Amino acid sequence: MPPKAADGRRPSPDGGLGGFVPFPADRAASYRAAGYWSGRTLDTVLSDAARRWPDRLAVADAGDRPGHGGLSYAELDQRADRAAAALHGLGITPGDRVLLQLPNGCQFAVALFALLRAGAIPVMCLPGHRAAELGHFAAVSAATGLVVADVASGFDYRPMARELVADHPTLRHVIVDGDPGPFVSWAQLCAQAGTGSPAPPADPGSPALLLVSGGTTGMPKLIPRTHDDYVFNATASAALCRLSADDVYLVVLAAGHNFPLACPGLLGAMTVGATAVFAPDPSPEAAFAAIERHGVTVTALVPALAKLWAQSCEWEPVTPKSLRLLQVGGSKLEPEDARRVRTALTPGLQQVFGMAEGLLNFTRIGDPPEVVEHTQGRPLCPADELRIVNADGEPVGPGEEGELLVRGPYTLNGYFAAERDNERCFDPDGFYRSGDLVRRRDDGNLVVTGRVKDVICRAGETIAASDLEEQLLSHPAIFSAAAVGLPDQYLGEKICAAVVFAGAPITLAELNGYLDRRGVAAHTRPDQLVAMPALPTTPIGKIDKRAIVRQLGIATGPVTTQRCH
């Protein structure tokens, strides 16, 4: 175990954790002085709740009957403590990075807080990530452990784990929730655990966890969120959304996402003694039943899912009646869709424009419909510093479009172990270049107008075109390729692979089968495959994606489409 500082805490922000960029000392001091940072560690969100509301229901699974199942705050606290002792006994030590990849369920909460209590740094993988992404996360973070389910949504995670262990010698511990196969059983590990001594508290300025980016310029990057900044993120979001102990929050997006985790999400609900219900199935039929069963009052969706829910109200026998607040974010919600959502699901729509890297913008409860339907909100915190600049880095005029740059008390100062990316993604003053094009209205609300980076926004997920193109070009049947986003009624954008075949063509099903075997996550694979005789280029020889999109509007060549689930 690392030596403790004089106050009993583990090492200070850099803590020997190479690759972490801490907040500059002057800004950190100002955030503490202003009261944004409380000096709490993230695991105290649970311990404080267990002390204040021990008997209140903390978490439940969507299928649980009210009054049966779930865990009280005291029970969740005890399980996290026992599991932390088990992890320590296994050999996981403070500062270790552990890949956490569990589906939505109470076990996610137990595992998250157990890792925090053990002093480990969870790497928040999503259930849809596969070997390519997990291997990248393991390599960048030098992870020593992996926590997965045995099987979820029809996918067996154990063969993937075997592949990862073979390729990454630092992955010494694989813990499986369910049938462990050749690995360690979570249930047996915890059953055999003693009480153990708690890990010394972490420095609040050090990383509490690593979120994953949308992969806008290649493989997803790792986002260090400190204890100080993430406690503020969750607490301030809960206050802005007026969460109370009477609320029931439905975790319907993947729980490892920043949005349902801390905006206010699971963690924000805990700060006020509310209940979080985990829903593994976001379909309207399953989600509406969970909302009815548990009296859900708050949830968060991406636009594609919000539109599907709203449309489903026309035929589903059970529709949401208890929702007081529906957050929609992840990509832009168009005004006509916002009106439809407010009419069909709840008038309490809240648009959220944020990023796992930090900055959050919300429309406010009580904002007029025009603001809620036509803008993506304004910053969470008075200390959020925003710059909107043109292509030359110069500030734009009032109401003009430009790229959004930001820094503040909960925005990162650098991706983890990504020096080259950080040189490109931050300006000399430490402002993060978001890649989002926005304009700021006179009332302070932002309107998102597009992206600077070459990305596709599919169902709330950001996919780097360059990363997919690299995978496409690895197929021997493909001579050249371009990935473009095409408008889609339900997904926002669908992924289209425009390719020139080297010889005999392949089908979309064959291509996606190949990408699956390469470990490419399902949500990043093409929805549409278009064969072209040649890819159009600009005068300087670059592939002209705007021309591709224009041509696809009148394409009559062979086109094969298939939804990617």
Curated annotation (Swiss-Prot):
GO terms for biological process: cellular response to iron ion starvation; siderophore biosynthetic process. This is Salicyl-AMP ligase / salicyl-S-ArCP synthetase. The lineage of its organism: Bacteria, Bacillati, Actinomycetota, Actinomycetes, Mycobacteriales. Involved in the initial steps of the mycobactin biosynthetic pathway. Catalyzes the salicylation of the aryl carrier protein (ArCP) domain of MbtB through a two-step reaction. The first step is the ATP-dependent adenylation of salicylate to generate a salicyl-AMP intermediate. The second step is the transfer of this activated salicylate to MbtB to form a salicyl-ArCP domain thioester. ATP binds at G214, G330, V352, D436, R451, K542. Pathway: Siderophore biosynthesis; mycobactin biosynthesis. The keyword ATP-binding applies. It comes from Mycobacterium tuberculosis (strain ATCC 25618 / H37Rv). Keywords: ATP-binding, Ligase, Nucleotide-binding, Transferase. It holds the Pfam family AMP-binding_C. Induction: Induced by iron starvation conditions. Transcriptionally repressed by IdeR and iron. Inhibited by salicyl-AMS, an acyl-AMP analog. Also inhibited by 5'-O-[(N-acyl)sulfamoyl]adenosines.
